[in-house]
Structure formats: structure tokens, C-alpha cells
Amino acid sequence: HIEMLINWSDESPAGSAVGGFIPYLDVTATIVAKNGNLEIAKLTPHINIIDNFHYAQNIKLPGAIDEIYKVTIIIDPPSDGELGIHYDWKERYGSLLDQKVFTYTNLSFEEIALKSRR
């Protein structure tokens, strides 16, 4: 299970609930094992008690549990027609957000992969 908490920060547009979930985003995770194998997953909204709303997907690691991984998360604004953006927002901010790309390297998932939530 890979997940991202994507919430408004204190630097977000006026009127945004700081810490509030940002819905309708297009979130993709690319997980690359040291052996070169990769897994691409579209993260979709999930909800649970601990994290509340978040983007996630159940995945299989593309390599061994004890390998080192690189993960790239691409966050795109909603596709056309998925979110109505009112005139006042569009005039002030243009769009919900610009594409964001986050890359994390030298990750070990071994401890997490061997745990169980239940």
C-alpha cells in the first residue's frame, strides 16, 4: 500500500482549510527498484480512521523486499470537467494548482513490507 497525504498548507490560497484534503487531483506514483524494474500506480482517494482522506493504491514492489527504491510522485490538477472552478478562483489563482513532482531516493520498504496493520 502506497499513500500520500495531500493537504492544504498554511501557504495555500485564502479560504483553503489548512490541513484539509485537496480532492480531484491526478496522482501517479512510479516505484523503481534498484534492479531497474518499476511499478506505476494511479493513486485514488481512500479514507480510514488514522489518516482520514488520502490518495493511495495497493501495489506490489517491483523488486525484492530488501532492495533500495526510488519513488516519484506526480501530482497534476484535475482533468478538464472533473472540477468546476468558479470565476473568482480562476481570476485570482488561475487553476487549482500547477503540477508538482516529488522524488524520494534510497528508500527501504523492508520494515513496512513485513508489518501488518491488523
Task: Tell where the protein language model's regions lie, with residue ranges.
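Short amphipathic, basic-aromatic surface patches that mediate peripheral association
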Residues: I2-G20
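Solvent-exposed serine/threonine-rich low-complexity stretches and specific carbohydrate-binding patches
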Residues: I40-I49
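Compositionally biased low-complexity segments at domain edges in trafficked proteins
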Residues: F102-R118
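Short, aromatic- and glycine-rich surface loops/edge beta-strands on solvent-exposed regions
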Residues: D66-P77
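Short, surface-exposed loop/turn segments at beta-strand-coil junctions that are enriched for proline
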Residues: K60-D66
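Extended low-complexity, serine/threonine- and proline-enriched intrinsically disordered segments
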Residues: G20-N37
